[in-house]
């Protein structure tokens, strides 16, 4: 009945080709207008997975209470010295706050910086650390006084000369204790002389953490997002970069601003997908043209196939938008699917038409004969493929669910256009007749070999596949989405550089507590877990033992503030600067000779460097002035601020800081960071899994970070398992209804399952992990695999033998080559996730093709009935 309907449909199209073509083009035109007016793509990746109500409620509660924390952009200010990094971050923050007031961007903050931390930083040390620090500062009063009196290159050279005089001779100062100062000074002068970015950090002399290069400071910006654009946060990122350029931070401080955070990571991900897409698309199209030529051997046939594909694709796009409203970053892949499988249908019909045309020159008869031969296989393949795609609709993975809906409908569109528009176009274009039947006659000996050794090959294949099943225990799912991002993109490279920095907070999880008291209690419980490295609440910003600390700071301030606030000396002339540098160079040389041992080499090095600086031009000395004196002035101002702390209470905390940790309704946030053992990668999957499990067990309300990622991974894996189960059940029922023989159903499904199992086994052998991106390849290959298996089992049921060198294999191989080109081009993508999907698609397609072309004929054996004589020509029985 189905075959009869298809033959009548094709016959009707062949008799009225002009009407069919005109009607198809009109439908395509209307569909194109609809797509142009309604095309939308939602780039919000948080909407790709439908969370369970409980999980969604936890996440939404945090987002409602602290909306300013969602999708933040972290601007990382890098400079040669921490003094410059801090100053550049201050300047950037002040300027961006004006942009925020104008509504161009969201709220701006400076985590760990700003007036609050500048004045109260010492209060966050322990009482003993405060006592030691203030004692050292007080004993350094003479040096501080000299530096503050003349904070210039001349003043520094003079102070160094003074220190190398009487204090060194009397033993008050020892050369080894000056080694760090001298060696770092020499390195900075050398950078100045070499024309490199240079800055001398005074903080780094007493703080080893400040000596890390490059020095960093941070600014957070809440982006204004547009999920209708490919890069939703691009506007805010552009404002930040424009502001940094306008401030000339690189010239003033040697500072560079790099952006990372949730939104820049998403934006750069889409950029990496887009990068090279045009070139890959052109190359792919050219390769597809070549494959179509090899398969069809006719320009007119190729033109007919391409027009059919275009019409079907536009109609599918219109139907897809009508069904789902807007595409997402996964469902947009329906285009690749449609091209891959749409070409398959067209090639199957086209190759069969060529075979029929070889036997009968009459084009009408050949077109109808091809429909009679391929109508039922195409209809069954279409329905089976659509069923496999529709199996994803009930799952919680919305991205793939919508892809399954659109792709499934698209299969029926592809079938309809293949059986109407394609025959009509071929009738109008009237390709020339065929001189030989399609196929691979040179593969006939292989067919004979497989037929003679069927049982050993079958048993050996199944033994290898079953024997390798234990490998599946080592199949790894990489749940970390950061591994799917381009490590060379600005946002990802910056994040990797920050992997040991608490400001990145990539792997932190959060807990929303009813009050600050509850948050503090939860933090105390979580601190006891060995997997937890640090917890933070608003109370973290209210230091303990403040009276004791403030008293120690006040004692130091009484001696140091008068020196720090004295008016500086007037600027020296360049001649005075040269004289001071020469004197310091000479004294350093004498000190190195008179005090051999530790520190002498550094003194000699600096002596030579200062001599070169004195002999250089004034512009070089001006750069040295900025490298030493500018950072000194900033450091002295920071020291003066640190010596003037305020009492910190809940009421005196800055309102923006309070708002980041306590909501207006009193709910409070706990931020929990993992404990990273020494030598372990902060993004290690096993460590993060243990951390997430421990925190979730202790506090079921915890959400975010690895907890949310693991939940999403479990949801996606569950979605694919359920979809695979429903797909197999639906395909089995469909095959049973159509084939009416349980053995024939197994002859279709067993090669499909074997191909899938071998694909996963090869993933283990080749070290390929499954991830959020490439797992999508499995249902795609399920659809392609079902189609191939159906073609072969239907040909076998019709009595066809010698399948390997038949026109069917000719069509399947070139169809697979086209699909491989469409899918395999993803392998060349700059985006690691897309590239991994291309790799898995290539592997899965290879396994599927071998399963269909080689294993399935061996499994089926000789057909039950001989092929009808009128269909046997051109086929080696």
Curated annotation (Swiss-Prot):
Biological role stated in the UniProt entry: Essential for hopanoid transport from the cytoplasmic to the outer membrane. Is capable of shuttling hopanoid lipids from the inner membrane to the periplasm, where they probably spontaneously insert to the inner leaflet of the outer membrane, strengthening the cell envelope. May be a proton-motive-force (PMF)-dependent transporter. Is critical for multidrug resistance and cell wall remodeling in Burkholderia.
Species lineage: Bacteria, Pseudomonadati, Pseudomonadota, Betaproteobacteria, Burkholderiales
Pfam families in alphabetical order: MMPL
PANTHER family in the cross-refs: MEMBRANE PROTEIN MJ1562-RELATED, MEMBRANE PROTEIN YDFJ
Keyword Amino-acid biosynthesis: no
Membrane-topology descriptor: Multi-pass membrane protein
Classification via SUPFAM superfamilies: Multidrug efflux transporter AcrB transmembrane domain
Key words, A-Z: Cell inner membrane, Cell membrane, Lipid transport, Membrane, Transmembrane, Transmembrane helix, Transport
Gene source species: Burkholderia multivorans (strain ATCC 17616 / 249)
Protein's GO biological process: lipid transport
Protein's name according to its UniProt entry: Hopanoid transporter HpnN
Places the protein is found: Cell inner membrane
Cytoplasmic topological domain: 1-16, 296-299, 352-373, 427-452, 740-743, 795-809, 859-877
InterPro entries hit by this protein: Hopanoid_biosynth_HpnN, MMPL_dom, Mycobact_MmpL, SSD
Gene3D superfamilies: Multidrug efflux transporter AcrB transmembrane domain (1.20.1640.10)
């Amino acid at each position: 009945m189905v075959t009869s309907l298809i033959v009548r449909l094709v016959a009707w199209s062949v008799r009225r080709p002009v009407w069919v073509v005109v009607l198809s083009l009109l439908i395509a035109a209307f569909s194109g207008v609809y797509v142009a007016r309604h095309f939308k793509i939602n780039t919000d990746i948080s909407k790709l997975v439908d969370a369970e109500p409980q999980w969604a409620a936890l996440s939404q509660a945090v987002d409602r209470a602290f909306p300013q924390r969602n999708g933040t952009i972290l601007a990382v200010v890098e400079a040669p010295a921490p003094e410059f990094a801090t100053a550049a971050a201050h300047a950037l923050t002040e300027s961006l706050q004006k942009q925020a007031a104008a509504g161009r961007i969201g709220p701006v903050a400076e985590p760990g910086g700003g007036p609050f931390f500048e004045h109260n930083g010492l209060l966050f040390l322990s009482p003993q650390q405060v006592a030691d620090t203030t004692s050292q500062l007080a004993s350094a009063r003479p040096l501080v006084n000299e530096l503050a009196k003349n904070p210039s290159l001349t003043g520094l050279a003079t102070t160094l000369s003074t220190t190398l005089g009487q204090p060194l001779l009397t033993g008050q100062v020892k050369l080894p204790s000056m080694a760090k100062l001298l060696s770092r000074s020499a390195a900075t002068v050398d950078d100045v002389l070499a024309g490199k970015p240079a800055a001398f950090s005074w903080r780094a002399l007493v703080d080893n953490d400040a000596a890390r290069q490059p020095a960093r400071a941070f600014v957070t910006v809440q982006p204004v997002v547009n999920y209708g654009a490919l890069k939703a946060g691009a506007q805010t990122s552009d404002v930040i970069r424009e502001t940094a350029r306008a401030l000339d931070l690189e010239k003033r401080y040697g500072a560079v601003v790099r952006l990372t955070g949730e939104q820049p990571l998403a934006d750069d991900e889409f950029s990496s997908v887009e990068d090279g897409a045009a070139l890959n698309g052109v190359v792919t199209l050219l390769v597809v043209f070549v494959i179509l030529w090899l398969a069809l051997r006719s320009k007119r046939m190729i033109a007919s196939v391409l027009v059919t594909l275009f019409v079907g694709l536009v109609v599918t796009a219109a139907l897809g938008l009508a069904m789902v409203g807007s595409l997402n970053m996964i469902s947009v892949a329906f285009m690749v699917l449609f091209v891959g499988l749409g070409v398959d249908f067209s090639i199957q019909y086209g190759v069969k038409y060529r075979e029929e045309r070889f036997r009968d020159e009459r084009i009408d008869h050949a077109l109808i004969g091809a429909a009679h031969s391929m109508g039922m296989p195409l209809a069954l393949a279409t329905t089976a493929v659509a069923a496999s795609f529709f199996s994803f609709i009930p799952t919680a993975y919305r991205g793939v669910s919508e892809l399954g809906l659109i792709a499934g409908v698209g299969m029926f569109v592809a079938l309809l256009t293949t059986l109407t528009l394609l025959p009509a176009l071929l009738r109008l274009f009237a390709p020339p007749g065929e001189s030989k039947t399609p196929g691979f006659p040179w593969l006939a000996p292989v067919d004979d070999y497989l037929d003679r050794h069927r049982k050993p090959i079958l048993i050996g294949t199944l033994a290898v596949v079953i024997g390798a099943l234990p490998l599946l225990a080592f199949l790894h799912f990489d749940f970390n989405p950061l591994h799917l991002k381009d490590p060379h993109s600005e946002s990802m490279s910056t994040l990797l550089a920050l992997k040991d920095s608490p400001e990145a907070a990539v792997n932190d999880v959060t807990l929303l507590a009813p009050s600050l008291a509850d948050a503090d209690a939860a933090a105390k419980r979580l601190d006891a877990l060995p997997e937890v490295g640090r917890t933070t609440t608003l109370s973290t910003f209210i230091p303990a033992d403040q009276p004791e600390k403030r008293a120690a700071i006040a004692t130091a301030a009484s001696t140091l503030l008068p020196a720090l606030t004295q008016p500086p000396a007037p600027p020296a002339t360049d001649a005075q600067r040269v004289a001071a540098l020469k004197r310091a160079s000479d004294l350093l040389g004498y000190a190195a000779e008179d005090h051999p041992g530790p520190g002498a080499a550094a003194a000699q090095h600096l002596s030579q460097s200062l001599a070169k600086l004195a002999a250089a031009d004034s512009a070089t000395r001006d750069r040295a002035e900025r490298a030493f004196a500018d950072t000194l002035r900033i450091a002295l101002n920071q020291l003066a601020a640190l010596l003037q702390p305020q009492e910190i209470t809940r009421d005196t905390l800055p309102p923006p800081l309070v708002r980041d940790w306590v909501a207006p309704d009193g709910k409070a946030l706990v931020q929990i960071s993992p404990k990273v053992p020494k030598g372990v990668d902060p993004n290690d999957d096993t460590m993060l899994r243990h951390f997430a499990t421990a925190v979730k067990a202790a506090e079921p309300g915890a959400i975010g970070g690895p907890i949310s990622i693991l939940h999403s991974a479990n949801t996606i894996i569950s979605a694919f398992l359920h979809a695979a189960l429903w797909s197999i059940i639906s395909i089995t029922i469909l095959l049973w209804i159509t084939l009416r023989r349980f053995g024939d159903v197994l002859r279709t499904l067993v090669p499909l399952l074997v191909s899938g199992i071998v694909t996963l086994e090869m993933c283990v052998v080749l070290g390929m992990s499954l991830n959020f991106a490439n797992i999508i390849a499995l249902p795609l290959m399920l659809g392609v695999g079902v189609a191939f298996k159906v073609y072969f089992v239907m040909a076998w049921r019709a009595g066809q033998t010698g399948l390997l060198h038949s026109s069917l294999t000719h069509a399947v191989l070139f169809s697979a080559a086209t699909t491989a080109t469409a899918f395999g081009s993803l392998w060349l993508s700059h985006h690691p996730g897309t590239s991994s999907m291309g790799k898995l698609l290539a592997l899965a397609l290879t396994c599927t093709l071998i399963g269909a072309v080689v294993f399935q004929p061996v499994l089926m054996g000789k057909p039950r009935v001989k092929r009808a004589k009128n269909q046997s020509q051109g086929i080696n029985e």
